[in-house]
Curated annotation (Swiss-Prot):
Pfam family, one: Ribosomal_L25p
Start and end residues of each stretch annotated as Disordered: 1-20
Organism from which the protein derives: Xylella fastidiosa (strain Temecula1 / ATCC 700964)
Name under which the protein is recorded: Large ribosomal subunit protein bL25
Alphabetized SUPFAM superfamilies for the sequence: Ribosomal protein L25-like
Length: 207
């Protein structure tokens, strides 16, 4: 598992006015909560977070949050608020992580070998990804940045369900599966060709 470090500083002033001043200075108001410690208000460099939030790992990995150079604290991103139309992160929430407590995290799916699968080699076939992430439960040390879904044997007319995915050791779905709740992940089927529009009434009738 790769280490991803985020630098931060403690935030002294709070409130809307203080948060507005932080944003004008190129910083983001944020908070750390969870565990046995009290919540801590912090501030983050906007440029660093803006670049980080463009990567999958920022949302599904354990992050090393270093506040005032005091050493890394293991956290997980729990909320990120963006401005509705500007390239601006408004606020970030981090949750402390305990090494012996299981987490419930949405992990992205990476689909491999689609183009070389039997369905991928047939013209006129549409392969749809019904899910792009799954909610898993695991200890922090077992948390994967992504889960691969191998489509090498996918045929036309086949459906890959959640129960068909191989999860890493120590990782399991957050919800139990049964026949009624085994969601489709990938579907391969022939493209539907719509018929030409019906002729207008009377068109082609002999007079």
């Amino acid at each position: 598992m790769a280490n991803h470090q985020i630098k931060a500083q403690r935030r002294k002033d709070e409130g809307k006015g203080a948060s507005r001043r932080l944003r004008h200075a190129g910083m983001i108001p944020a908070i750390i909560y969870g565990g046995e410690q009290r919540p801590v208000s912090i501030q983050l460099n906007h440029e660093q977070i803006w670049l980080a939030q463009q990567n999958e790992w920022f949302y599904s990995s354990i992050l090393d949050l270093n506040v005032d150079g005091a050493g890394a604290e293991k956290v997980l991103l729990r909320d990120l608020q963006r401005h509705p139309y500007r390239q601006l992160v408004m606020h970030v929430d981090f949750q402390r992580v305990s090494s012996d407590a299981k987490l419930s995290v949405a992990v992205p799916l990476h689909f491999i070998n689609q183009a070389t699968s039997p369905a991928g080699k047939v013209g006129g076939v549409v392969i749809t990804h019904e899910l792009n992430e799954v909610q898993v439960s695991c200890l922090p040390k077992d948390l994967p940045e992504f889960i691969e879904v191998d489509l090498s044997t996918l045929n036309v007319g086949h459906v890959i369900h959640l129960s068909d995915i191989t999860f890493p050791i120590g990782v399991e779905l957050s919800t139990r599966l049964d026949k009624e709740h085994d969601m489709a992940v990938v579907i391969a089927k022939h493209a539907v060709i719509e018929d030409d529009a019906p002729a207008e009434e009377g068109e082609g009738d002999s007079k």
